């Protein structure tokens, strides 16, 4: 990326989409970061945006936001099928771009966007915000400090209890919908950050709820030479499931509950305010004799994604989520789907050059 914004200049941001993700995550996180100015929102519901963001201009179409001359950064938080076409439009307009996860619908779209961003010398990043979750940061610290020895079994769950199918695009049979494309990117990205690319992927993806049109359950195994990673998400888990369970060759660690930042944002808590990101659910490490010892869970802070985006645009640091890392997530997403469809073990379809960039 060669197009660096002059240090000290406020970065004007256009947010495309003001549904659940745009309203709950992107808007408040952007507004909490000094140096970022949420200038425009593209939404068909101007009244909703004006009620929440009275000082922000609302435009009816993404094209108006993308082509506005004052906009430096375009954040795409619209439905998954629109990610690639809108990001393409924004990159061609010379804008810096953040895309919500999943990056795109498939690897081809992702590679096309990466090539276009390189051609235009603009920043392209993907919103893998759960790198800054308290639960993940706590587990990461335990592993890196050697408290459980060498990891042999790593299990990551994001489970919910929503037995009733809701009328929303994520639960309809449309491109990019389903639970695996919704929650899979989070748990894949965290696993890849910890362990790198797997040797192979085994996926089992299903539709279990009565009346469901698209997958609402996924169980995926990432195979590594010395350990196994299990990624699981479900809409039919009322309780009794740990967020993380990790077994090493000298001890084990459990994190029971998920990071609280989403629930805080839904409650209207301002990012960075008192108690933001705090997690009262301790990590529990079990020693070789099975005795538990609690360890305080660190604070989460998803603001860090946009703080680091701001710094990257000012030339102070690198892109916090380079697009090749999001491409790797897409590769695992696709491998799991293909494995589930065919009943076979799959490898991750990345080129040697892409793999080298991930080292």
What are these regions (language model features)?
Residues 21, 293-307:
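Active-site loop of classical SDR/Rossmann-like NAD(P)-dependent oxidoreductases
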Residues 112-129, 150-154:
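Rossmann-fold dehydrogenase core element
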Residues 1-53:
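N-terminal Rossmann-like dinucleotide-binding module
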Residues 56, 93-95, 120-122, 224-227:
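A short helix->loop->beta-strand "cap" motif at the edges of active sites that frequently abuts
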Residues 189-271, 303-319, 336, 352-359:
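Contiguous beta-strand/loop segments that form the cofactor/metal-binding neighborhood of enzyme cores
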Residues 56-115:
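Beta-loop-alpha module in the N-terminal Rossmann-like domain of NAD(P)-dependent dehydrogenases
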Residues 1-10, 73-75, 308-359:
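C-terminal helix-rich "cap/oligomerization" subdomain common to oxidoreductases
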Residues 130-211, 219, 343:
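Predominantly a Rossmann-like dinucleotide-binding segment in NAD(P)-dependent oxidoreductases
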């Amino acid at each position: 990326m060669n197009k660096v914004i002059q240090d000290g200049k406020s970065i004007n941001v256009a947010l495309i989409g003001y549904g659940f993700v745009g309203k709950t995550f992107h808007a408040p996180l952007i507004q909490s970061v000094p140096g970022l100015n949420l200038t425009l929102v593209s939404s068909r519901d101007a009244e909703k945006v004006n009620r929440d963001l009275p000082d922000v201009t609302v435009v009816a179409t993404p094209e108006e936001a993308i082509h506005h001359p004052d906009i430096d950064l375009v954040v795409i938080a619209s439905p998954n099928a629109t990610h690639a076409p809108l990001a393409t439009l924004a990159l061609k307009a010379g804008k810096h771009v953040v895309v919500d996860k999943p990056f795109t619908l498939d690897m081809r779209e992702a590679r096309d966007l990466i090539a276009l961003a390189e051609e235009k010398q603009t920043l392209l990043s993907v919103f893998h915000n759960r790198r800054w979750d308290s639960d993940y940061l706590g587990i990461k610290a335990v592993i890196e400090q050697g408290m459980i020895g060498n990891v042999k079994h790593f299990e990551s769950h994001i489970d919910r209890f929503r037995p009733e199918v809701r009328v929303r695009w994520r639960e309809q049979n449309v491109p990019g919908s389903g639970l695996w494309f919704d929650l899979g990117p989070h748990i894949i990205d965290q696993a890849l950050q910890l362990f790198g690319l797997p040797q192979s992927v085994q996926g089992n993806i299903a539709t279990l709820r009565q009346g469901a049109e698209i997958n609402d359950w996924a169980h995926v195994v990432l195979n590594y030479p010395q350990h196994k990673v299990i990624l699981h998400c479900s809409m039919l888990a009322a309780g009794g499931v740990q967020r993380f369970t990790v077994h090493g060759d000298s001890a084990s660690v459990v994190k029971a509950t998920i990071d609280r930042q989403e629930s805080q944002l839904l409650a209207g808590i301002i990012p960075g305010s008192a108690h933001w990101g705090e997690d009262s659910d301790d990590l529990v490490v079990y020693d070789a004799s099975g005795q538990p010892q609690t360890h305080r869970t660190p604070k989460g802070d998803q603001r860090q994604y946009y703080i680091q985006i701001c710094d990257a645009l000012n030339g102070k640091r690198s892109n916090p989520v380079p697009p090749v890392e999001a491409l790797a997530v897409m590769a695992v997403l696709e491998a799991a789907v293909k494995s589930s469809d065919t009943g076979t073990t799959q490898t991750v379809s990345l080129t040697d050059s892409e793999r080298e960039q991930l080292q």
